[in-house]
């Protein structure tokens, strides 16, 4: 391992080894230890006491973060011509159907979210090989297959994200930017964790929230005491 920079040393000194911080402390600390010239993303990792290999222990859901993610989300709407104007007005970056299906078949995936209608899903099924591995396949559970595409576009643009537990039992997502205030970071984290708690599978035994870590793109992970999440 190379030598630590001055900023990395300062950051390392601020985090006590093995200590679990309150969510309130962690929300401020992650700002204090991030030294970057760009507006770094903030990530949260929640390890769950579930076995994702079992269908009845899969944790998947949708959450609308109170302060958004701070990211510019590029949205493609695949819809019928009568819905195009509303989708564009709602803020979709790309709107159409057959021409975009052909582009995706050719490997184009320069987007973050695809929203479509139930009647279009038959055409999109063939794109699974391209979209599936990138997590771009529209899904009714995440609200990206809907008759009201305009409403879905607005929700995504305002900070609605979908998530699911990975094969290691961890739910990982971005909950903002380091430029957010500590209170905004805490609000977003609380909403995300509260949503995960509501989704606890009835078949999950033992401790459900095993650990929570908050970090930025440029920082070490800060361990959070799960019992402090609901504190004011």
From Swiss-Prot:
Gene3D superfamilies, per the entry: 3.30.190.20, 3.40.50.790
GO BP terms in the entry: regulation of translation; translation
PROSITE patterns reported for this sequence: RIBOSOMAL_L1
Pfam family name, one: Ribosomal_L1
SUPFAM superfamilies xrefs: Ribosomal protein L1 (SSF56808)
tRNA-binding in keyword set: yes
One GO molecular-function entry: structural constituent of ribosome
InterPro entries linked: Ribosom_uL1_bac-type, Ribosomal_uL1, Ribosomal_uL1-like, Ribosomal_uL1/biogenesis, Ribosomal_uL1_3-a/b-sand, Ribosomal_uL1_CS
Keywords annotated in UniProt: Repressor, Ribonucleoprotein, Ribosomal protein, RNA-binding, rRNA-binding, Translation regulation, tRNA-binding
Keyword RNA-binding: yes
Taxonomy, superkingdom: Bacteria
One term under GO cellular component: large ribosomal subunit
HAMAP family referenced in this protein's UniProt entry, alphabetically: Ribosomal_uL1_B
Subunit record text: Part of the 50S ribosomal subunit.
Family statement drawn from the similarity comment of this UniProt entry: Belongs to the universal ribosomal protein uL1 family.
Record NCBIfam families: rplA_bact
Cited function: Binds directly to 23S rRNA. The L1 stalk is quite mobile in the ribosome, and is involved in E site tRNA release. Protein L1 is also a translational repressor protein, it controls the translation of the L11 operon by binding to its mRNA.
Name this protein carries in UniProt: Large ribosomal subunit protein uL1
Primary gene name: rplA
